[in-house]
């Protein structure tokens, strides 16, 4: 997390010992750990430790993902030391371990316990649904540009324009529409997001929003998967029609999501969902609030 963000201070007040990867004591903590849990294996301060001798043979490295992986990420995963990958759904596990995939992972290394944060999400289920959540995936190039030049907000305008147009159309049709704004982008341009005129949520408000949403519309974001396990209908729509979205769309259609090629098709899908003609697949719905307990039990074992 960003050292300057409120969560750093909050975690310190909660009793956690926090170490900056660039500060004193981190190397000793890393090398002395029996188990290392990571939520981001791409962090430039950490990524170099995941190859070569960065992790000892007697250590266990666990990738506690921050989102469901339904995109083809094998080039990234296969190049890093990953002893365990935590996942949330049967489709996700199959995509990581099946013989026809390019991943080197097997069912032995992939633990389908669910994510601990899903325990809170489960407690919110059953609320009245009244919203449509739009969740465009973040763009790392735009994020890097904003980080080096805060005035590069024109890139945000281009990225979000089709989504804001969709939001305007849905709002005009009397659907309450909410935009998911990726925290990394909001961090660099908070004023831009506040001035949108469309309700926007980031990570902290996301569980409540998902529990109240009929559907989640996304191009390639894992927020779509979060929504589907929370009982939302998934709608895959990529206004930029990128080729790698096809695989993402196909995998989600196979588990009950709706594919849309145009904004008009998104409107029709939303109408069908709100009218009850299309419902979320029940086999994806969170069954309990036991993910944290399941993961903790496995971590306490001496072997993978």
Give short role names for the model-derived ranges:
Residues 1-120:
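Active-site and donor-binding regions of nucleotide-sugar-utilizing enzymes
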Residues 21-26, 183-225, 229:
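Donor nucleotide-activated moiety binding/catalytic core segment of transferases
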Residues 48-69, 151-162, 231-243:
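A short, gly/pro- and small-residue-rich
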Residues 107, 191-194, 222-286:
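Catalytic binding pocket for nucleotide-activated donors in carbohydrate/polymer assembly enzymes
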Residues 116-192, 260, 293:
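Conserved catalytic-core segment of nucleotide-activated headgroup transferases in glycan assembly
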Residues 287-304:
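C-terminal alpha-helical cap of glycosyltransferases
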């Amino acid at each position: 997390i960003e050292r300057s963000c409120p969560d750093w201070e909050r975690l310190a007040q909660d009793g956690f010992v926090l170490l900056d990867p660039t500060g004193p004591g981190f190397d000793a903590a890393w090398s002395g750990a029996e188990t290392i849990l990571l939520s981001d294996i791409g962090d430039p301060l950490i990524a170099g430790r995941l190859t070569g001798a960065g992790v000892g043979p007697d250590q266990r490295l666990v990738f506690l993902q921050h989102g469901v992986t339904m995109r083809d990420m094998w080039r990234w995963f296969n190049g890093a030391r990953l002893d365990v990958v935590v996942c949330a759904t049967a489709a996700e596990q199959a995509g990581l371990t099946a013989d026809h995939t390019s991943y080197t992972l097997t069912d032995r290394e992939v633990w389908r316990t669910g994510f601990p944060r899903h325990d809170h999400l489960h407690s919110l289920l059953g609320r009245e649904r009244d919203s449509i959540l739009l969740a465009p995936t973040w763009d790392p190039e735009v994020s890097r540009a904003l980080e080096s030049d805060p005035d590069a907000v024109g890139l945000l305008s281009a990225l979000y324009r089709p989504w804001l147009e969709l939001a305007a159309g849905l709002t005009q049709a009397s659907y309450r529409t909410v935009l998911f704004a990726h925290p990394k982008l909001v961090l660099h341009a908070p004023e831009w997001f506040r001035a949108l005129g469309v309700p926007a949520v980031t990570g902290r408000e996301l569980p409540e929003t998902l529990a109240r949403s009929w559907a989640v519309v996304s191009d390639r974001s894992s927020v779509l998967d979060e929504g589907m396990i929370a009982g939302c209908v998934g709608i895959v729509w990529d206004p930029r029609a990128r080729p790698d979205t096809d695989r993402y769309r196909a995998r989600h259609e196979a588990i009950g999501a709706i594919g849309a090629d145009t904004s008009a098709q998104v409107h029709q899908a939303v109408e069908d969902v709100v009218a009850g003609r299309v419902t979320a697949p029940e086999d994806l719905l969170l069954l309990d609030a036991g993910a944290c307990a399941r993961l903790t039990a496995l971590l306490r074992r001496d072997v993978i």
